[in-house]
UniProtKB/Swiss-Prot annotation:
It catalyses: ATP + H2O + a folded polypeptide = ADP + phosphate + an unfolded polypeptide. This is Chaperonin GroEL. The keyword Isomerase applies. One of its GO terms (biological process) is protein refolding.
Amino acid sequence: MAKEIKFSDSARNLLFEGVRQLHDAVKVTMGPRGRNVLIQKSYGAPSITKDGVSVAKEIELSCPVANMGAQLVKEVASKTADAAGDGTTTATVLAYSIFKEGLRNITAGANPIEVKRGMDKAAEAIINELKKASKKVGGKEEITQVATISANSDHNIGKLIADAMEKVGKDGVITVEEAKGIEDELDVVEGMQFDRGYLSPYFVTNAEKMTAQLDNAYILLTDKKISSMKDILPLLEKTMKEGKPLLIIAEDIEGEALTTLVVNKLRGVLNIAAVKAPGFGDRRKEMLKDIAILTGGQVISEELGLSLENAEVEFLGKAGRIVIDKDNTTIVDGKGHSDDVKDRVAQIKTQIASTTSDYDKEKLQERLAKLSGGVAVIKVGAASEVEMKEKKDRVDDALSATKAAVEEGIVIGGGAALIRAAQKVHLNLHDDEKVGYEIIMRAIKAPLAQIAINAGYDGGVVVNEVEKHEGHFGFNASNGKYVDMFKEGIIDPLKVERIALQNAVSVSSLLLTTEATVHEIKEEKAAPAMPDMGGMGGMGGMGGMM
């Protein structure tokens, strides 16, 4: 297929047009008074969203060069969301402003490479000032404030996220699901839970709830399949002498072994339950090891030279309470050494940092949470499917942003942090590097201006007023007042501001230093020919009518 090439100003102007269109669609969602965007779906009802990245993801332009510009900035919005959970609109607004200012200067003759160098230096200096101005997230109240702002000022969502984090800790897993009704709920599972239920309903101790509960129990862990009773008989006799319940976690328990366990349970000889080991393959081995470390036990594996026949009571794990239903097993109050658990947690964190697979990362984070204290499930309620999707997106964003705040700290929100940081930056640059520096200094005012415009105020006037002051002084777009942002709880995670600025500068630099674009020429499809009408029979005899 033939390709078309665009050069220099012609290419950059078309790229800018794509960035402008994306920016104009996304910018309206910014701030507490941001507007909704209605998105047509290929089937079903249109979706309504105030989430910048959801809007950006839907945008495809007909002009191939303009579309390339839009796609590059869209990628920046997505990357910002992935890394920080929020700040997609901030990144888009910054990228547009930097590109617009830069394009004007490059068209006037500035050297793009020198301009880029100045932009990079300015961004780095601003980020350093942001870090100095940040403060660590203190208590539950600040977590609630961050989550509320990221959920588009929904205080109920902010409170749910803060409650969830308080219950499971900053390393705990918090998942978001759809509720059955219209109310939002929070469910917390304490201890380690895995998705394997009892192998026989005859192990049940509570017939009403259909659960098996074992208190102060031993746990036998093995990666073997148990089919013969003689494999575990010596160990059973030893545990019976101790008079404690026993949970067996094995690859499988079948045949004679399972039958004998059930019969002895029913007769009251043994207080016992059995479940299959969680996971598959290598992940199963790692999860068994996690349970062993949490409970102070040892996985009985032939790979380690251990056999069930020769196993001692010292190899068994211990837990204060174990609850098993038909689908899940929950181990609470494992008696493992806290130092061993900390070492295992550190090991899993290292694996999370080094893995490139999203699936592996998710599974490792689940394991980390189970070792760290529990899993919280936020159940989002809504009256309609459209509202449910929009609300679920907001909760996901707020959750990620809150984790970012706990990780790196917080700065004042409402677009004021960038302006305050820039006020403290004074770089002695020359020529076109200085042009790049000044481009960034002007562009960082854009987020605050846009928040004010969306709330119905004059962006320029608001920016000027904020620039006149220092410290935590900023603009509350919810009520149009100038306030102490920290006292009002208007805060942003440092990580969100940092990544938004870094990504915006990165993509703008790429666009400004682009000298040519190559794209396919769309071939015009010829209109299909009219079908052959054939001879119009019978017309020949009309001569006789004369």
